[in-house]
Amino acid sequence: MCAASASPDNLVFHMKNEMRNIKYKPVDYQQLRALTEAKKLASASAKLKIRKAMLTSKLSKEQTLIKQHKQVWWQEYQRLNEVRCKMESEIKSLLNEENIGNECLCDLTNFEQELSEQQCTYLKNVINPIQQLRADLKYRQHHTLQHSHPHIEFNSMKVLEEVDFVKKQLKTVFERLRLEQQRIENDLSDWSIKILDHSLEEKTNPLSELPIELESLECPYPDLKSSILSEFYKFTQKYQKKLQDFNLQLEDIYRNCQLSEEDHWIYQAILDQYPGDLFGRRTLYLDMLQRYFPHKSRHDLVEHEKYCDQYRFAIEQQNILISNWNKNKKDFIQKAVLTLTEACATHEMESMLAKDKKKQQELCADLKAKVRQWRAHQEEVARLEMEISARRREKEEEKEKLWKKKELLQRAEKKKKIKKYWAKKKQKWQEMEMRDLQRLEELKKLIAEQSLKDRERVKYRQELLERRLMEKKEVALQEAHEDKERARRLEALRKQVAVVAQFDPVRMMSDTMASKARMGIEIEEEFILQKPLFTLNTYNEQQIISDPRLRFELALREAGLHRTLYAKEILPKISPQKPPRKDMESTVFKI
């Protein structure tokens, strides 16, 4: 029943028939409108604050990005300036060398002289007249502003015609220079394309060419050489297939690239400005690319970055493939040369063995006769050597006896010298030992005195540390006591300002004294003039005089020093006897 009465249809029925329900109160639409307006204003102000915060954050982010860009630009400017100076110095040193027979250097010097002459003529015929015209126009403008003449209109028309004529001439000159620049850029691009094609041919041709080392080698076994060449062709075909895959991949990446050649050159130059170890490098160069290419979205730039990474990765893989091929080719050639040389050596050995067998049989007979003759000679030589060695042994025994006698005499003399030397050495050692013992006793005394001083210092430092710790403890106890006293005073103040009035509905609903006075109820018949209107709770005379600030000021006035700098500095530093309450302290001058 309650659910049925609370349904929307019943509520609509009650509202149409003006049948009130005790559960619902009448709605104050004006109050609701005021609340909604206040909410709208609060939400609008919050929205405005959020927008301002977003704008300030965006501006600060933009400023930080520009600051980082400036740092990178300055570093890049310094680097490019150093490179430019280095290249100019190298070019000058190259051109200044005495290369009489070098026609290329002579052509370069002539071309440099021709360019300098063209620059001088351009400055003389184009830039200097423009600067003179500009200075003349500034002078005329300044002159006409200061002095007014009747023929100003005629002169201004003439000047405008002259300026238009100069503009047309400059336009034709700039157009001619632009065409010449475009022609030179096209020539340079053609040469760069030729150089790239030549480099690609140099990269791809070595894979298809047969090495000279394998062609020049001769092998006595033709089957072995043909098998080595077929193995080399299989080896190169595998690498050629991989290289063709990389070339196709590079062509696909170049075809899918959305930027033109000039835009890609700008893109690469911007990326080269920011070093790889820079913090936030990708954010910085993407921001700079969006500034350079406002017609391109961030998605397009990221896609181009992905294509460039793929292109760079493919180039690196291609270079790795070519380096691996060169390395494997060298290894293969070394192995092939080694096998062919071994085959040639074995073939030569086989042919030499066949020849050596015949020679060996012929030499065997000659060797047998020579061996017999050699044995007879050897026996005679051995007999003669034994006789000679016996004679020499007798002579050596006689010499050894004489040498032993001399050695015994020399040893006796050496023993005497050694005894004298050790006596002197022992005396020196005793003197050194006595001197070292005296020095040791002196050092021990010094160390004992120093240790005594160190103990006294340590004891003094310990006493000083204990005194400081006691002072810190006393300060901590004093602070704790002050905190307790402060809490007690705050509690007393809270009790003083606490609400003590009891709930009195009769007094609340009755008339006040002011309303009674207005209506003439309970009015006193006589007005006592001496009666104070209000009760004042102020300081008495004794409390005012006991204030140290007043007493110090009176003393300064009596001495005539109340207007000096000393009084101005010392009076604000004097604190009252009782510090003021924190809730009564003024904060007007602290804002």
UniProtKB/Swiss-Prot annotation:
InterPro entries: CCDC148/CCDC112 (IPR039902). Residues 166-195, 352-417, 466-498 form a coiled coil. Transmembrane segments: none annotated. Keywords: Coiled coil. It comes from the Eukaryota. This is Coiled-coil domain-containing protein 148.
